[in-house]
Amino acid sequence: MLKYLIKFYPKILFIIEGTLVTLKYSIIAVILGLVIGMLLAICKVNKNCVLRLFANFYTSIFRGTPLLVQLSIIYFAAPYIISIKFSVFMAGVISFALNSGAYVSEVIRAGINTIDKGQFEAAEALAIPKFLIMKDIILPQAINNIFPSLVNELINLIKESAIISMLGEMDLMRRAQIVSIETYNYFFPMLIAACCYYILVMLISFIAKIIEKKMIVN
């Protein structure tokens, strides 16, 4: 086993380098997804029925169709529909962010609904604008309540980002596939990729627990 590791050390490094690509997609997508999710969640709790219908329709579309289909439409069909050819990176980030936003919106909506309505009514009685009530009072509390769920969404994105290899992006999965073809050995490269994904997830979970404890103390 040791001789095998030494022999394939350069290829192991080649696979591990894909971790940065996977992280890049996941972090950017989850940040954009959080922004989209917040906007959708605000629409869902809004009294305007048009905004609620739009937000619910958006969520149903992106939760009701596979991420792979969404990625394929954005990358392959966009040039024919809107005459724009997205790069692999842009197509990946857009599809991941739009998909993540749908799930995050439901999480944030649930978090907003857990906040005592009396706080909103008290703020309105003080003539505080609704935008500031949501931004400074409701959302900060909701985010604290749903932090573990947001971390789970980041973890899901890290694992689901493997489908970007379908478009030839040199992420963890794609690099493992290349090494598998070159060495005629599928088990070892895929094992290395699986270990990288696992370490990433465990590391994020560990950091999230530390942050969560500090949030509880504060």
Curated annotation (Swiss-Prot):
This is Putative glutamine transport system permease protein GlnP. Belongs to the binding-protein-dependent transport system permease family. HisMQ subfamily. Its main location: membrane. Keywords: Amino-acid transport, Cell inner membrane, Cell membrane, Membrane, Transmembrane, Transmembrane helix, Transport. It is found in: Cell inner membrane. The keyword Cell inner membrane applies. Part of the binding-protein-dependent transport system for glutamine; probably responsible for the translocation of the substrate across the membrane. It is a multi-pass membrane protein. It holds the Pfam family BPD_transp_1. It comes from Rickettsia typhi (strain ATCC VR-144 / Wilmington). The chain crosses the membrane at residues 25-45, 57-79, 86-108, 187-207. GO terms for biological process: amino acid transport. It comes from the Bacteria. The keyword Transmembrane helix applies. InterPro entries: AA_ABC_transptr_permease_3TM, ArtM/GltK/GlnP/TcyL/YhdX-like, MetI-like, MetI-like_sf. SUPFAM superfamilies: MetI-like. Residues 19-208 form the ABC transmembrane type-1 domain. GO terms for cellular component: ATP-binding cassette (ABC) transporter complex. GO terms for molecular function: transmembrane transporter activity.
